[in-house]
Amino acid sequence: VTAELSSIIDFIRYGASRFSAAGLTFGHSHDNPIDEATHLVLAALHLPPDLPPAYGAGKLVAEERERVLGLIERRVSERVPVAYLVGEAWFAGLKFKSDRRALVPRSPIAELIESGFAPWLDHRHVERALDLCTGSGCIGIAMAEYNPDWQVDIVDISPEALSLARENIVFQHVEDRVEAIQSDLFAGLAGRRYDLIVSNPPYVTEDEYAALPGEYSHEPKLGLTSGEDGLDLCLRMLDEAADYLTDDGLLIVEVGESERALAKLLPEVPFVWIEFKVGAMGVFALERRDLIEHAKAIRAAAQARR
């Protein structure tokens, strides 16, 4: 069958058919087999994602055919995410290096970045921002790209993830505005305060992790799980964040499917669950003053995990 394939669009169609027939999971950057196959084929050929349709008729040479077919086969047989196969992923319209040192870039927070965090920052002045649990660095670097007057710190406990994040800082040419810091949450940030703290921390429960499709087994578990209910790290963050926020500071955190568990655990805390184009995505916003007002309940919940 593959001998009959010749054009770029042929290989995209073939890849999409193989992915669909194999029942692959599309949770890393794409949600369907056609976009997944398009990403794989174009990246493997070193072509841009917005390639004009006319180029789809272009023919692959023998070496390119072999490379693309090999990647399609690995995507199916090994369940490796496309971003890892081709070494790149897109987030908030920006290209990032991606490999097994950190999770594949993905978060609804990209939509917030692209919209200027409207309406959350409409009446706030931001000079310093923090991306906590940065992984590949995608959130913090994207914040700096979209807001050239911000200074952004990106933090992770994993030296492997930070090495990738530092490569992405250079890749996006934001060395003068983004600093990568290895730290267990706020431990290495003494004396620093931020107008905005954004985080996509690990929040997958142990039961959820055990049931995840094979694609997720290629990602570092440290970046996915956080205790039995997925909230261990989030609670520590809530307990400590006020000390690192400016007086009018804002905290935005993604907790995904752990949203209900968090709301149930801290019912008196006025989490504002942000609505995205596709609806709620388990991302909350919380003012520093609310963290202070409910500090006792938050600390009790956090200390119960220690």
What is each PLM-predicted segment?
Residues 5, 34, 61-65, 103-106, ...:
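Short, solvent-exposed loop/helix junctions and linker helices
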Residues 22-27, 116-124, 245:
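Alpha-helix termini
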Residues 46-47, 102-103, 203:
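Active-site/binding-pocket entry motifs
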Residues 2-92:
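N-terminal auxiliary segments of SAM/dcSAM-dependent transferases
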Residues 54-56, 60-62, 66-148, 157-164:
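SAM-dependent Rossmann-like transferase core, predominantly class I methyltransferases
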Residues 12, 37-38, 68, 136, ...:
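A general structural signal for well-ordered alpha-helical segments in protein cores
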Residues 112-115, 146-306:
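S-adenosylmethionine
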